[in-house]
């Protein structure tokens, strides 16, 4: 998932920085880094992991945490 993909997901979900960070279980700062594509502390490009991409896909599909998902 590229930062542009992440931004598109963020926009499609109508998340704010706070609601998106809470949904993914990360800090607001980490979420902001993913949206910008750069680390706010080093300025270096960041990589959004496959795990995060899969979590985004699950949330977009209306799925919650496994323990609360119908399975």
Give the predicted meaning of each segment.
Residues 25-46:
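Recognition helix of helix-turn-helix/homeodomain-like DNA-binding domains
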Residues 1-2, 26-27, 59:
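Intrinsically disordered, low-complexity regions enriched in Ser/Pro/Gly/Gln/His and often acidic
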Residues 44-67:
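DNA major-groove recognition helix of helix-turn-helix/homeodomain DNA-binding modules
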């Amino acid at each position: 998932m590229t930062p542009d993909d992440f931004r598109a997901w963020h926009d499609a979900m109508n998340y704010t920085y706070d609601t998106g960070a809470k949904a993914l279980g990360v800090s607001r700062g980490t979420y902001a880094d993913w949206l910008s594509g750069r680390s706010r502390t080093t300025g270096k490009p960041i990589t959004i992991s496959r795990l995060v991409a899969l979590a985004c896909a699950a949330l977009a599909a209306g799925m919650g945490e496994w323990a609360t998902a119908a399975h």
